[in-house]
């Protein structure tokens, strides 16, 4: 397994797919990285030369991925909560942030339904 940005990427998959195992790299970014490094998308990770691996590492190092990206996202959410914006309040309360209805759904964000005693008749 090749190690890129602290993540072991699978050997038997194509490089374009294997790079998506790194947090912050999707399919589009993966294709851009390979184009900049001059590597074919169809080649498998196990068939990469050490020079090609180094070229991929250099391209990935120029992008914010893994821990740095997670930290930045968390800091952005924390900033929204501190300034007291609507989005920050929704984050703090554990409710949907992007305007979804909460009367019936939003179970993923709100958690398991809690029964209220004395509600049934």
From Swiss-Prot:
InterPro entries recorded: Rbsml_uS13_C, Ribosomal_uS13, Ribosomal_uS13-like_H2TH, Ribosomal_uS13_bac-type, Ribosomal_uS13_CS
An example Gene Ontology biological process: translation
Cystine crosslinks: none
Pfam family, one: Ribosomal_S13
PROSITE patterns, A to Z: RIBOSOMAL_S13_1 (PS00646), RIBOSOMAL_S13_2 (PS50159)
Bias type Basic residues, positions: 106-121
Subunit structure: Part of the 30S ribosomal subunit. Forms a loose heterodimer with protein S19. Forms two bridges to the 50S subunit in the 70S ribosome.
The protein's name: Small ribosomal subunit protein uS13
Species this protein is from: Streptococcus pyogenes serotype M1
């Amino acid at each position: 397994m090749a190690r890129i940005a602290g993540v072991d990427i699978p050997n038997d998959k194509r490089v374009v797919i294997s790079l998506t195992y790194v947090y912050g790299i999707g399919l589009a970014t993966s294709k851009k990285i390979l184009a900049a490094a001059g590597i074919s998308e169809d080649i498998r990770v196990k068939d990469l030369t050490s020079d090609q691996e180094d070229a991929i590492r250099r391209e990935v190092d120029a992008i914010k991925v893994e821990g740095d990206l997670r930290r930045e996202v968390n800091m952005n959410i924390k900033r929204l909560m501190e300034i007291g914006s609507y989005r920050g309040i929704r984050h703090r309360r554990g409710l949907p942030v992007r305007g979804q209805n909460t009367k019936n759904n939003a179970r993923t964000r709100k958690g398991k339904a809690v029964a209220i005693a004395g509600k049934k008749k």
